[in-house]
Amino acid sequence: MRTLTLLTALLLLALQVQTQSLEETADQVPAQDQPGAEAQDITISFAGDERSAREASKSLIGTASCTCRRAWICRWGERHSGKCIDQKGSTYRLCCRR
């Protein structure tokens, strides 16, 4: 039982280190790719039919905090809920925390 606990703790530590290194990599985006101080319009779209998109958007209202991320994965505690497209056509990952 102690061995299982130790292995689980090591696995969680390895996952946390990997997540932190991915976040650091995402934070090192060149300056020209960083959004400026000007306001930017973002379009949020959900894959699937209109009904599922409506249901997904209703489930996000008031219960989630969402962020458009450049990283390939969402951060700890977030889940991938769709995509964001800026005015230039760049696609980002919509990550929501409940």
From Swiss-Prot:
<dbReference type="GO" id="GO:0050830">
    <property type="term" value="P:defense response to Gram-positive bacterium"/>
</dbReference>
<dbReference type="GO" id="GO:0071222">
    <property type="term" value="P:cellular response to lipopolysaccharide"/>
</dbReference>
<dbReference type="GO" id="GO:0061844">
    <property type="term" value="P:antimicrobial humoral immune response mediated by antimicrobial peptide"/>
</dbReference>
<feature type="disulfide bond">
    <location>
        <begin position="68"/>
        <end position="84"/>
    </location>
</feature>
<keyword id="KW-0964">Secreted</keyword>
<dbReference type="GO" id="GO:0042742">
    <property type="term" value="P:defense response to bacterium"/>
</dbReference>
<dbReference type="Pfam" id="PF00879">
    <property type="entry name" value="Defensin_propep"/>
</dbReference>
<dbReference type="InterPro" id="IPR016327">
    <property type="entry name" value="Alpha-defensin"/>
</dbReference>
<feature type="disulfide bond">
    <location>
        <begin position="66"/>
        <end position="96"/>
    </location>
</feature>
<dbReference type="InterPro" id="IPR006081">
    <property type="entry name" value="Alpha-defensin_C"/>
</dbReference>
<feature type="disulfide bond">
    <location>
        <begin position="74"/>
        <end position="95"/>
    </location>
</feature>
<keyword id="KW-0929">Antimicrobial</keyword>
<dbReference type="GO" id="GO:0002227">
    <property type="term" value="P:innate immune response in mucosa"/>
</dbReference>
<feature type="signal peptide">
    <location>
        <begin position="1"/>
        <end position="19"/>
    </location>
</feature>
<dbReference type="GO" id="GO:0005543">
    <property type="term" value="F:phospholipid binding"/>
</dbReference>
<dbReference type="InterPro" id="IPR002366">
    <property type="entry name" value="Alpha-defensin_N"/>
</dbReference>
<keyword id="KW-0211">Defensin</keyword>
<feature type="propeptide">
    <location>
        <begin position="20"/>
        <end position="63"/>
    </location>
</feature>
<keyword id="KW-0732">Signal</keyword>
<protein>
    <recommendedName>
        <fullName>Alpha-defensin 1</fullName>
    </recommendedName>
</protein>
<dbReference type="Pfam" id="PF00323">
    <property type="entry name" value="Defensin_1"/>
</dbReference>
<keyword id="KW-0044">Antibiotic</keyword>
<dbReference type="GO" id="GO:0051673">
    <property type="term" value="P:disruption of plasma membrane integrity in another organism"/>
</dbReference>
<dbReference type="GO" id="GO:0005615">
    <property type="term" value="C:extracellular space"/>
</dbReference>
<dbReference type="GO" id="GO:0019731">
    <property type="term" value="P:antibacterial humoral response"/>
</dbReference>
<dbReference type="GO" id="GO:0050829">
    <property type="term" value="P:defense response to Gram-negative bacterium"/>
</dbReference>
<keyword id="KW-1015">Disulfide bond</keyword>
<comment type="similarity">
    <text>Belongs to the alpha-defensin family.</text>
</comment>
<comment type="function">
    <text>Has broad-spectrum antimicrobial properties. The antimicrobial activity decreases in the present of salt in vitro. Binds anionic phospholipids, which leads to the aggregation of liposomes in vitro. Membrane permeabilization of the target cells is an essential part of the peptide's mode of antimicrobial activity. No hemolytic activity against sheep or horse erythrocytes.</text>
</comment>
